[in-house]
Amino acid sequence: MVLLLGLIVIGGVTFFISNAPSEEQQQKSEEMAMQKTPGYETMTAVAQIANTHLLENAILNIQVTPKDDYEVVLLQLQTTEFLTEDILLKNTYNLLQDIRKIETIDTFTVAWFALINSENTEVLTLTFNRQALEQAAKISYNELPSIVTDYRKHESLN
């Protein structure tokens, strides 16, 4: 009787272990679930654009907030050295040429950070609505402040 019970338990454990998903299958399932997450496609597209136009490790954070049929995106970037407002505007302009092609983005904010007195500080932030994103293709980089819905500049950029 005990022997029979032991065989049943061992058989059940063996069956359970053999039917458990492998680590690879588990990872694939998780990746597929992430791809179905609202905003995931936009987040990966924004990351690819930023990595194409900027130095490696420039991305601090990307937040995509789905709102009905559109998305609100926040891209936080790190400068490797303290740059001028002019250079940050040029870099932002270059990003916008591809960002504007992502039609689901309704509001796009780019925030630049730099080390000031050993502290990571937000030095320039620009927020664009959909209309401003479209306009960015028709103006020069130094006109970006005139089309944004929000423009914040740290005093160190003066």
Q: Where on the chain are the PLM-derived regions?
A:
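Hydrophobic single-pass membrane-insertion segments
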Residues: 12-25
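Short, non-transmembrane amphipathic alpha-helical segments
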Residues: 85-106
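Short edge beta-strands and adjacent turn/loop segments
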Residues: 26, 33-80
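Hydrophobic membrane-insertion alpha-helices, especially the h-region
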Residues: 2-15
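Surface-exposed flexible segments
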Residues: 26-35, 90-93, 117-130
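Solvent-exposed loop/turn segments at secondary-structure junctions
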Residues: 80-83, 116-118
